[in-house]
Amino acid sequence: MTTLSPENSLSARRSATFILEKRNPPIDKAEWDSFFDENGHLAKSRDFICINILERGLHPFVRTEAWKFLTGYYSWQSSRDERLMVDSNRRRNYNSLCQMYEKIQPLLENLHGNFTETRNNIAYDIQRLYDKDPLGNVLIDKKKLEKTLLLSYVCNTKAEYQRGFHEMVMLFQLMVEHDHETFWLFQFFLQKTEHSCVINIGVGKNLDMLNSLITLLDPEFAEHLKGKGSGAVQSLFPWFCLCFQRAFKTFDDVWRLWEVLLTGKPCRNFQVLVAYSMLQMVREQALLECMSGDAILMACNNLIDLDADELISAACVVYSELMQKEVPQPLKEFLL
């Protein structure tokens, strides 16, 4: 076991306070532009920018460009001219992938049963997706969404299509203007978050680390979850598969959490601390009523309309507490 840095503990607690008190507004276009020199090179440190995003968030007018840096679509070391070239190359590569897909689609249909099944699943999921805002205006182009999901499935050997990806990609489509941006940002998001939302890659690891975290920080609750409440934690996989998308009030809240995950602040795999913070919301009721695993799961599923800033702040406090503990090596390596 290892004790983690007390400086990190103080920093995380300070961030939690800043988030809740909203001491400074989200980073707007003028401030974002001030982070770069006349050639478009970074004039502030990447660390400085990421901490500010954690503590303050991004104005919607800045989000698209900032996410290109956060995901790795753009290099933090690039100039403005280099980014124009990168964007042009990404567009060209996307078009090449689309052409390739058109050519091999008949082959996939004839030789790969999984392709037909996946295409049907995507079509079914998209058909059920509500695509209008409260005023009845159409938000997204379902045909383009289907195309992005199919192309992602064919091209991504690590992350096969899973239920819920259609909702995630929809948020990328709402954020950006062009199809190639939607496609690449989603691919880079999966990579940057270490495929933590992919059920056959990162979700199981998240659940194991969540169990370790509960055992370390809340032994009483851990005992209940091993006894009468058994099975509850392992059933929380939809939280990770959807990156908590269904827990929030608005799309802005979802984007707010996701961009924090992309910063790597205050630690890697922050999503597990977020899940722990959500579990703490039902802890008292679970222990008081001696709830079963199914009842705990139902209570967790009823956690909706959450405020992203409040949840991020709570998870920062958890990280601060964790820094003062003797942390098992696997958990330490997972978070650092």
UniProtKB/Swiss-Prot annotation:
- Record-linked InterPro entries: Rab-GAP-TBC_dom, Rab-GAP_TBC_sf
All copies of domain Rab-GAP TBC, residue ranges: 57-265
Q: Which PROSITE patterns match?
A: TBC_RABGAP
Q: Which UniProt keywords apply?
A: Cytoplasm, Cytoplasmic vesicle, Cytoskeleton, Differentiation, GTPase activation, Spermatogenesis
Q: Which GO terms describe its biological process?
A: flagellated sperm motility; sperm axoneme assembly; sperm mitochondrial sheath assembly; spermatogenesis
Q: Which Pfam families match?
A: RabGAP-TBC
- Asked whether the keyword Cytoplasm is assigned, the reply is yes
Expression (tissue specificity) = Expressed in testis, specifically in elongating and elongated spermatids (at protein level). Expressed in the sperm midpiece (at protein level).
A single cellular component GO annotation: sperm midpiece
Q: What domain of life does the native source organism fall in?
A: Eukaryota
In the UniProt record for this chain, what is stated about the effect of gene disruption?
Male mice are sterile, characterized by defects in sperm tail structure and diminished sperm motility. The mitochondria of the sperm-tail has an abnormal irregular arrangement, abnormal diameter, and structural defects and the axoneme structure of sperm tails is severely disturbed. Sperm mitochondria cannot form a proper mitochondrial sheath at the subsequent mitochondrial compaction step, although they can coil around the flagellum.
Check the UniProt entry and state the signal peptide residues, or none: none
Tell me where in or outside the cell this protein is found.
Answer: Cytoplasmic vesicle, Secretory vesicle, Acrosome; Cytoplasm, Cytoskeleton
Instruction: Extract one GO molecular function annotation from the record.
Output: actin binding
Q: Per its database record, what is this protein's job? A: Acts as a GTPase-activating protein for Rab family protein (s). Essential for the establishment of male fertility, and is required for both the production of normal sperm number and sperm function. Plays an important role in the formation of intact mitochondria, outer dense fibers and axoneme within the sperm tail. Essential for sperm mitochondrial sheath formation and for the interactions of ARMC12 with VDAC2 and VDAC3. May be involved in acrosome formation and cytoskeletal reorganization during spermiogenesis, possibly by regulating RAB3A activity.
Assembly, per entry: Interacts with ACTB. Interacts with ARMC12. Interacts with TOMM20 and DNAH7. Interacts with RAP1A. Interacts with RAB10.
Write down what this protein is called: TBC1 domain family member 21
Q: What organism is the protein native to?
A: Mus musculus
The lineage is: Eukaryota, Metazoa, Chordata, Craniata, Vertebrata
